[in-house]
Amino acid sequence: MIYREVLPDKTLATSINCFWMIQASEAEALRDRTFPDGCQEIIFNVDTDVLRNDGHGYFSNPAVELVGQMTRPYDIVTRGRQTFFGIKFYPHSFSLFTDYSIHELRDQSIDVRDLLPDGFQAVVEQVLARRDFSYFVHSMTRYFQQLVSAIDITSRTYHLVDQSVRRIFLDKTSSIESLARHLNVSERYLQAAFKLHVGLSPKQLWKMIRFQRAFQYLDNPATPLADLALACNYYDQAHFTHSFKSLAGISPGEYRATAAPLNQHFLNKTSHAYLCNYRTGV
């Protein structure tokens, strides 16, 4: 299975984290679990059926889907050629491109053609016909460049959220009180701004970012969980295990023993598609 990433050009660097691709050499069926990562993404499931378990059974995801902010893990089954093209946004940046409530899109997989302005459908048809990752990156870049050129990203609320996300990524804050104080706004205003642009509270995003940091240590079975907890700024191992399980649905030990045929590509510490907190250029 091949995994590739392409970073956006400078015109999109503050709104798109990266473009990514997964492609297998032959058709197969896979099972995996997806975890909350604080970001939204568009995924083209090319010649691949994706079923997601929402707790009431498995349901088919759209061929071209927006994966809204996740607040819990989801088990998935994929069948077919295992070809996926993706666009990973920052926690707040997809809000620039749609009039829909980001908060209302949480924990949903939605046909993204229903969310974006006219013109996207034609681009989708061309991408699905070509089935070429380079063409996908080129087409999506042109489309979102056109959207960005017509968007006002200077609003006070968006700028405030952008500053907040940067500080959370850089681990410069650990509470909404300190974050609001640094930005000279009320906690209520900051909470409302996050709900509008991120779909999560600052506390939820901070929890997810810290959760992500654990994976670079979990890949090494020789790292004791107590040491991992301290490295990721948890109070102790018990606190880490409880927090991890609330977002992963399994314990750290169970995760180490579980196969992740798709997630393994995103959880690598060099990946931009999942571990976006390691980038400081947001």
Residue ranges and their predicted role:
Residues 1-162, 166-177, 183-187, 201, ...:
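Alpha-helical bundle regulatory/interaction domains
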Residues 154-156, 167, 194, 198-218, ...:
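Alpha-helical DNA-contacting segments of helix-turn-helix folds
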Residues 179-180, 190, 214:
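A general nucleic-acid interaction/assembly signal
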Residues 196, 220-227:
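Extended, basic/helix-rich recognition subdomains
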Residues 205-208, 234, 238:
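Conserved structured core elements
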